[in-house]
């Protein structure tokens, strides 16, 4: 519909009617085009969904073709059909893209640009037309006797009429252009869409026409395939009947004699089979899983598609033993540095086979995997016997002070070579024996069991400062003086690095299990004259000698009774008990007193590892216990007091109570007590080697254990040594006091931290119905009170979170991280002050 420009100038009723008709037509065509665009969008979206689904279908056909690789007929057929269908899908995609461009985008552009511009011009035209009507009314209403108003109304009417005519001409022009463009846009878009449809079907026909000969050939092959399938079915039915008849007479009992393992299997799988595994949850459920030993690892999976779960990452760091103390039969346990795994076989023969397979794999891993291959794995979790914590890396760096663990431990006398075979550069250690070992000897030690030797790597495991210092206090030379004292007399020859594994294993078992080379104690009931121990001052290996001063520690030349020397330790500890407490402001921080503690290290310090500091001059002067042993020293004034309290040998009642027999004639348990009290690690190691029970309670001394004596002696390192050798941290004396009670009574913060770390029960009550916290509060020891309260808070948080773990032991909950760091910082602090 075209609007005449002349009618526009006249603004006649015909013009207005035409304008209204055109506007109505534009509104209707806009609605129709919007609907068509939406329908086209829906069609395109549905087409894209169809294309996406078709592509998935084609992908499924290709997967089926890959699955049928063994059958060339099916594989080739599916592959060709998948290629053809993929082309058809591509043609569909082209069709829908063309529909989107030709219909949706083109018509939508016409509606949004041209129709919108028409609407905006219409709004301006309507507004000007209203202004013209208003100007005409005002001009008609202007009074004759007011020329000023008449002139103003006339001028406004003239301007409004000019504006109306100008805008009306533009509006009519836009209407005519829109009417012409509407026809072109609609026809052009539909023509393009139909061309796309034509191209789609032509391409599809051409594609399928080329495939038609192959489809006819395949149809002929299918006819023959039906015949062949019928023949094959009859043959399979005949075989099925024959096999079913034969199995009726077969015995299905399982032949356990066929169970075997092969360490050198080409596939790398030493042994595999089903085992029951006890879960680590609170219910301890048992689940059947498929286990295998491969690549020096113990792994399992539930289904073939499941990823392998690694139980033991490195078999060199684990051990295996049968378990007879649980209710279920045929069980065995695999112990790794981080956890233990309880497994159950289906029979005794299978259990033996699995145990032997694990042991053989461990030996094979030692032979085939040198220690250097794993040297980069320095941050492995420590073994359970040492209760390693998450902050072990930080504390290790603090304890080593720039040296590596390997260099520091190897610098001890005798540690430059293996303590059993003499091979240079040993990188493994037995932490409860205090010796360094080569990789082959460490494997033999591991086979002895953790009750005999606890093996740890100097490069693969993390080392707590207290354990590192313990290793530096002993060493191969000191330990071999005990375990190889009568080596030459026994007629045995110590193996060398080139000796066979059998020779090394026999030697190690004779040395540590049979203990054939220990110096035997004389069998005489008593000596004619009582022997005494000479107590003299000596320096620790790592201290530097300095000239003595008037107030320095002096050499005690008089021969003191052994008991006087030992009992003086407790006297000195009581004398130098720390009296500094937290200030109220310091309680706001767990570590605020560290600097004050380090700055205040002075004469009140007693021993190098007691947690009470070191000597004022930086040296670690000690008293010799027996021959070449290490105990703490006393000042000149304290030595006099000790001599005065002990008295002469003939009249000293305390010495008579302890006995004046030679150390070699002491009961091993009593020797362990005295050595622990005197902080003499070599003597304590000798006592344990001679059969001393680590938890032996001395009935004549209120049932105290060696661990309690170590607390009274004030040595954190001796406590660590006893704990590594199986000391019970919760065993009480006749007064109901555990080691934690005694450490709290004496204000030994470092030992309190060590016992809390090792799972000491802080709720235990003594005969006076006091727990360690009550004792610490009564003694006004702010640091121990703070530690015990933090321990209780951590325990309560662990119980609230239902974290697994034995009562009193430190669990791995993140809520305890700060407390565990605090514990380790305390221990590290007291070790560094020495």
UniProtKB/Swiss-Prot annotation:
Domain Arf-GAP positions: 403-525
Annotated ANK repeat ranges: 702-731, 735-764, 768-797
Region spans: Disordered: 375-400, 633-653
Composition bias, Polar residues: 382-392
Keyword Zinc-finger in record: yes
Zinc finger (C4-type): 418-441
Start and end residues of each PH domain: 268-363
Domain of life assignment: Eukaryota
Biased segments, Acidic residues type: 634-653
GO molecular function list: GTPase activator activity; zinc ion binding
Keywords annotated in UniProt: ANK repeat, GTPase activation, Metal-binding, Repeat, Zinc, Zinc-finger
Protein's GO biological process: neuron migration; regulation of neuron projection development
InterPro entries (UniProt xref): ACAP1/2/3-like, ACAP3_BAR, AH/BAR_dom_sf, Ankyrin_rpt, Ankyrin_rpt-contain_sf, ARFGAP/RecO, ArfGAP_dom, ArfGAP_dom_sf
Claim: Repeat is one of the keywords in the record: yes
Pfam families reported for this sequence: Ank_2, ArfGap, BAR_3, PH
Entry's Gene Ontology cellular component terms: cytoplasm; growth cone
Known role: GTPase-activating protein for the ADP ribosylation factor family.
Annotated protein name in UniProt: Arf-GAP with coiled-coil, ANK repeat and PH domain-containing protein 3
Provenance organism: Homo sapiens (Human)
Gene, per the UniProt record: ACAP3
């Amino acid at each position: 519909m075209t609007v005449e420009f002349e009618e526009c100038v006249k603004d006649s009723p015909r013009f207005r009617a035409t304008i209204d008709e055109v506007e109505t037509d534009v509104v209707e065509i806009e609605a129709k085009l919007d609907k068509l665009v939406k329908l086209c969008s829906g069609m395109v979206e549905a087409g894209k969904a169809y294309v996406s689904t078709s592509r998935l279908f084609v992908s499924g056909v290709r997967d089926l073709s890959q699955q049928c690789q063994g059958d060339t007929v099916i594989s080739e057929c599916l592959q060709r059909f998948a290629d053809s269908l993929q082309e058809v899908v591509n043609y569909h995609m082209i069709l829908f893209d063309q529909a989107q461009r030709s219909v949706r985008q083109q018509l939508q552009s016409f509606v949004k640009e041209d129709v919108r511009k028409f609407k905006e011009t219409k709004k301006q035209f309507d507004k000007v037309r209203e202004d013209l009507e208003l100007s005409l009314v005002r001009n008609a209403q202007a009074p004759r006797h007011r020329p000023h108003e008449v002139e103003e109304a006339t001028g406004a009417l003239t301007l409004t009429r000019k504006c109306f005519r100008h805008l009306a001409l533009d509006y009519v022009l836009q209407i005519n252009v829109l009417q012409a463009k509407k026809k072109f846009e609609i026809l052009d878009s539909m023509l393009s869409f139909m061309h796309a449809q034509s191209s789609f079907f032509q391409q599809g026909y051409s594609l399928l026409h080329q495939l038609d000969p192959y489809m006819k050939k395949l149809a002929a092959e299918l006819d023959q395939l039906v015949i062949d399938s019928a023949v094959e079915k009859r043959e399979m039915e005949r075989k099925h009947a024959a096999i079913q008849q034969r199995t009726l007479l077969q015995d299905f009992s399982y032949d356990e004699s066929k169970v075997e393992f092969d360490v050198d299997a080409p596939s790398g799988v030493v042994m595999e089979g089903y085992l029951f595994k006890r879960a680590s949850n609170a219910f301890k459920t048992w689940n059947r899983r498929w286990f295998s030993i491969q690549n020096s690892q113990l792994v399992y999976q539930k289904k073939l598609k499941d990823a392998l779960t690694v139980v033991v990452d490195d078999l060199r760091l684990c051990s295996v033993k049968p378990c007879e103390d649980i209710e279920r039969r045929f069980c065995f346990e695999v112990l790794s540095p981080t956890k233990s795994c309880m497994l159950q076989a289906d029979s005794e023969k299978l259990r033996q086979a699995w145990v032997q397979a694990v042991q053989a794999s461990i030996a094979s891993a030692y032979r085939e995997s040198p220690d250097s291959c794993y040297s980069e794995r320095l941050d492995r979790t420590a073994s359970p016997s040492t209760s390693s914590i998450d902050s072990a890396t930080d504390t290790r760096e603090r304890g080593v002070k720039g040296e590596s663990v390997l260099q520091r431990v190897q610098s001890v006398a005798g540690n430059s070579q293996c303590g059993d075979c003499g091979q240079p550069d040993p990188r493994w250690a037995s932490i409860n024996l205090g010796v360094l070992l080569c990789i082959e000897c460490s494997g033999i030690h591991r086979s002895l069991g953790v009750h005999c030797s606890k093996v740890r790597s100097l490069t693969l495991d993390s080392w707590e400062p207290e354990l590192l210092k313990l290793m530096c206090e002993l060493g191969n030379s000191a330990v071999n003086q005990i375990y190889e004292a009568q080596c030459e007399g026994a007629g045995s020859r110590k193996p060398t690095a080139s000796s066979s594994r059998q020779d090394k294993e026999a030697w190690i078992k004779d040395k540590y299990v049979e203990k054939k080379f220990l110096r035997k104690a004389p069998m005489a009931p008593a000596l004619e004259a009582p022997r005494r121990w000479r107590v003299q001052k000596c320096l620790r290996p790592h201290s530097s000698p300095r000239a003595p001063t008037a107030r320095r520690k002096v050499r005690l030349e008089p021969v003191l009774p052994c008991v006087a020397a030992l009992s003086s330790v407790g006297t000195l500890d009581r004398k130098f008990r720390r009296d500094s407490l937290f200030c109220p402001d310091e309680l706001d921080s767990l570590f605020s007193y560290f600097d004050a503690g380090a700055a205040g290290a002075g004469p009140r310090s007693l021993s190098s590892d007691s947690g009470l500091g070191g000597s004022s001059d930086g040296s670690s002067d000690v008293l010799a216990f027996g021959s070449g042993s290490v105990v703490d020293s006393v000042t000149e004034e304290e030595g006099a007091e000790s001599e005065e309290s002990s008295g002469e040998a003939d009249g000293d009642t305390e010495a008579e109570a302890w006995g004046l027999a030679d150390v070699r004639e002491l009961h091993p348990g009593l020797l362990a007590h005295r050595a622990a009290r005197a902080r003499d690690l070599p003597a304590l190691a000798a006592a344990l080697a001679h059969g001393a029970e680590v938890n032996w309670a001395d009935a004549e001394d209120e049932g105290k254990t060696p661990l309690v004596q170590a607390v009274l002696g004030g040595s954190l390192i001796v406590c660590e040594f006893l704990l590594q050798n199986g000391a019970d941290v919760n065993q009480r004396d006749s007064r109901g006091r555990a080691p934690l009670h005694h450490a709290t009574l004496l204000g030994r913060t470092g030992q309190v931290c060590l016992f809390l770390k090792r799972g000491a029960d802080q709720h235990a009550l003594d005969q006076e119905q006091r727990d360690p916290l009550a004792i610490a509060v009564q003694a006004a020891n702010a640091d121990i009170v703070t530690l015990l309260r933090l321990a209780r808070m951590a325990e309560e948080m662990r119980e609230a979170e239902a974290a697994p773990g034995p009562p009193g032991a430190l669990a791995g909950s993140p809520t305890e991280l700060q407390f565990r760091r605090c514990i380790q910082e305390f221990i590290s602090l007291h070790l560094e002050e020495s």
